[in-house]
From Swiss-Prot:
It comes from the Bacteria. It comes from Escherichia coli (strain K12). This is Protein YpaB.
Length: 47
């Protein structure tokens, strides 16, 4: 759910490419938890 909200937010901000790269890293096995935390922190800072 959070990733979908982030996707919409980033898409509206015109940062779709940045999001795609971040999601690609987030989906890497073994690093998903760390990356998700990193993405959430960045989105909080951006908004």
């Amino acid at each position: 759910m959070t990733l979908l909200q982030v996707h919409n937010f980033v898409d509206n901000s015109g940062r779709k490419k940045w999001l795609s790269r971040t999601l690609g890293q987030t989906r890497c096995p073994g690093k998903s938890m760390g990356r998700e935390k990193f993405v959430k922190n960045n989105c909080s800072a951006i908004s």
